[in-house]
Amino acid sequence: MVKQEPETYSWDDFVNDGRTDWTGVRNYQARNNLREMTAGDRVLFYHSGKEKAVVGMAEVVKSSYPDPTASDEQWVAVDLKPVRALKSPVLLAAIRYDKRLSQLPLIRQSQLSVMSLTKDEFDIIVATGDGKTRKKAAAKKK
């Protein structure tokens, strides 16, 4: 999951750009999470600030490389492209309410700008945003 204040760079900005380099991350744990991303990985896009909601899904199109905005080579960036918006934003309040998401870094380390999710956590959030329960989502795959 990547977080951004919509006033700085919104989901709509991202969609209009069609692709972006995710630069400027200067937190060691967030940097380590960027390093773990590889091309083809799916990422959730979270609006922080006033909105506090997961709003879309993106894909990593270029694995980590040295961040061109950093003077120090220890910092990395990845390139992302939008995949699709969720049908409805998944509010932080809904994430906090869902016991299956209680270990989510978004709740436990709220200042972290880039965080890893398990496949189950990712799927739960996407199903919630698309108005499906996990059982309904699983049934459609069969």
For each feature predicted by the language model, list its residue ranges:
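Short, charged, solvent-exposed linker or helix-capping segments at domain edges/interfaces
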Residues: 13, 89-95, 125-128
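Short, charged beta-turn/beta-strand-edge "cap" motif at the junction between a beta-strand
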Residues: 46-52
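Polybasic, lysine-enriched low-complexity intrinsically disordered terminal tails
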Residues: 123, 127-142
